[in-house]
Structure formats: C-alpha cells, structure tokens
Amino acid sequence: MEKPSREAFEGNNKLLIGIVLSVITFWLFAQSLVNVVPILEDSFNTDIGTVNIAVSITALFSGMFVVGAGGLADKYGRIKLTNIGIILNILGSLLIIISNIPLLLIIGRLIQGLSAACIMPATLSIIKSYYIGKDRQRALSYWSIGSWGGSGVCSFFGGAVATLLGWRWIFILSIIISLIALFLIKGTPETKSKSISLNKFDIKGLVLLVIMLLTLNILITKGSELGVTSLLFITLLAIAIGSFSLFIVLEKRATNPLIDFKLFKNKAYTGATASNFLLNGVAGTLIVANTFVQRGLGYSSLQAGSLSITYLVMVLIMIRVGEKLLQTLGCKKPMLIGTGVLIVGECLISLTFLPEILYVICCIIGYLFFGLGLGIYATPSTDTAIANAPLEKVGVAAGIYKMASALGGAFGVALSGAVYAIVSNMTNIYTGAMIALWLNAGMGILSFVIILLLVPKQNDTQL
C-alpha cells in the first residue's frame, strides 16, 4: 500500500493554488494559440499548415504520453513529476518566444505537450493522496475550474493578450505563472506508490500507442484528401489496426503495462473515463459553430466568439455547483443531469436552418446549456474516476482519464471539422454545420447511455 504520510501532511490552500496554476499552463495558456493563428503566420513568416501543426501538436503529445507519465508519477513521485512538468512548460515557452524560427515553435509546443502529460495525472494523484472527503471534492472542483474553465476562456484570453500586449506575452505570463506554481508546491512531501516495483518502463507499449494515435490522427484529418480507396489510406488504416491489436495483446501479457486494463473491470471508472472522452469530443461544437457563423452569416471572429460568452460564464459557475450536487446526490445523477443539459444545448446550436435572429438567440441559449451541462458533469466525473482507482494505481488511472480528455478533444475536433467540410462540399455550409453538430449531439447521447449503464448510484468502491 501507499503511505503518503497523511498524519504529517494534509493538503492546504497553498498547495491547491499551486496545483491549479500548474494545470492552467496547458488549458489556458498553451491552448490560447487557437485564436492567434494569423498572427503567428506573419510573425514566423510561414504557412497556415505549419502553424496548425504547432497548434495541434501540444494536445496530441499530451494525450499520447499522459498515461506513461501517470505511471512514472506512481513509481518515482507525483510531486517530482509535477515539478518536471512545470519546468518543461518553462522550457517550451522559452523556445517559442526567443526566435521567429518555425521549427523552434513546433519543438516548443511539443515540449509543452509533454509538460501537460506530466502535470495532469500527477496533480490528480496529489489530490487523491493529500485531500480527503469533502476537501478532495473541493480540490477537484478547483482542478476542474483550471482545466474545463481554462479551456473555455483560452480563446478570448489569447486574443486579448495578443491584441493588447503581443502574442509572446501569452508565454511570458505562462512562465511567470509556472514559477509561482513551483514556489507554492515547494516543500510538499513526496507521495508515490510503494507497491509497484521499479521495473523497466514499457517502451514497446508506448511506441505502439504513439504509432496508433498518430496514424489515427492522420486518417481523420487527411482522410478526405487521401481518398478512402487510395493505397496510402489503406496502408495507414492497416497500420492503425495492426498497432492497436498488437498493443492490446502485449499490454495484457506485460508484467508492468503502460495501460493497466484491470482498471476497466471497475464499471464506475470505465463509465467516467468513456463519458469523459465523448464529452471532451463535443469540443468540435466550437470549431463548427464559429466557422459557420463567420462563413454563413458573415460575422467577425469577435462576434462569433461573443455568442459563446454564456458558455464561458456557466462552465465556471457550475463547476462548484457540480461539487455540491456530488456531495448531496452522489456521482451518477449529476453526471446524467449535466450530460442531458449539454445535449439540449447542442441541439439548439445545430438549428442552422433558422433565420439569423432566431439562430443567434438559439446559439446564446444553447451555449448557456452547453456550459451549464459541462460544469455540472466535470467534478462528479473526475471524482468517480480517481475514487474508484486503487491508491497504488491512481497515477496510471488519472493518466488514462486525462488521456481520454486530450484525445477526445483532439479527435472530436478533427471528426467535426472533417464532417463539416465533406457535407458542406456535397450540399451547403448550413447543412454541413447542422450534420457536424448532430455528430456532437450524438456523442453526448452515447455518453449519457454509458453513464446510465456503467456508473452505479452509490460508489461503494470509493477509497
């Protein structure tokens, strides 16, 4: 069993602030580039394709390595991995701002992805170790504010900073926040698993996972350009299927696997993780809806972003409400309520056939429900995932949960964008946007069914 010395140390507000600040280095600062793509094209004198690679590579690398980092946190120390992640963010930020060389921009963003992979599971594990009962639920609420809230604010934040101070100040501020986080976390006793032997790291599993995810990403983002009957597409599909199959076989046989599939024997953990993947996938809503109102209704990017202000406000407000609902109703009901409300919001945003004024009203109300639903869902889902993981495996469990977040968002955006482009070319942008938004609503419905079937009414397995 793990011995985190709770008698000697209990989580406090100083540590919690440090944790939240470390979390927003990714969800707020690193993600802010989604709103400064044209500026980066001019600053680095490069094409939009290169900039898009730089923007997307952070979340992709975070998703690919977060599980492995969770395992390292369990073995070598969660405080240590958190500090390493913060230092990596500082290094990545410096590489981004010191020159106008596109290669350094991409390398810096890649390093920021590795930073997020270290920080996310390690900080969740620290909360699991040093916060108990209602204190843990409160800590998870603030952690969720840093992640879900940060992702909601990042677009406006990036645009505001880039306009008022210049885009490099996004990362200068990120470095300052990182240094403050290091100071606040300093002095916290180390916590790690005592029951996991320090075996050789599962390199084979990691390599196969990276190959599989990179191949899937290429298939989704470039599939329509390649053509589903092309030799390259078929080859990539075979590589993806083959690497996935081999990964499953090797991981089940490994004595110290990268992903411990035994965790999924717990239905509550499986339900929380699968629904988390799908509800992060509905991030495609923002891409599709914003693109539609700009191209279809002639709105500026600022006007398009203004439609989602209700989402930003509600997700921040409702995260703490979700915590209170968790304490009074348990995990399942808030997760179902949140997902159901989100589906209603998604359906309202998809009504692209309405006259402009009516559609704008539906969008504003829809985004309100969208943020309300995600805010209610966030804390109960996170609590369900880590509360149902064995203490000695909590780093790996948290890593898998956050991998679901990162990859759900990445693939949700890719799928939504692909469907929007394909259907728009076949029909028109109104129909393309509607079908793509229905895809997101479908992911919400599937998430609702998973929660209904897998998450128990009472979490008897909570530790």
Swiss-Prot record:
GO BP field: response to antibiotic
Main location: membrane
Keywords: Antibiotic resistance, Cell membrane, Membrane, Transmembrane, Transmembrane helix, Transport
One GO location term (cellular component): plasma membrane
Subcellular location: Cell membrane
InterPro entries, per the entry: MFS, MFS_dom, MFS_trans_sf
Domain of life according to the entry: Bacteria
MF terms (GO), sorted A to Z: transmembrane transporter activity
Transmembrane segments: 17-37, 53-73, 86-106, 107-127, 142-162, 165-185, 201-221, 230-250, 273-293, 299-319, 334-354, 357-377, 403-423, 435-455
Classification via Pfam families: MFS_1 (PF07690)
Function: Multidrug efflux pump that acts independently of NorA and is one of the factors that confers resistance against diverse quinolones and chemical compounds.
Membership in a protein family: Belongs to the major facilitator superfamily. TCR/Tet family.
Protein name: Quinolone resistance protein NorB
Provenance organism: Staphylococcus aureus (strain N315)
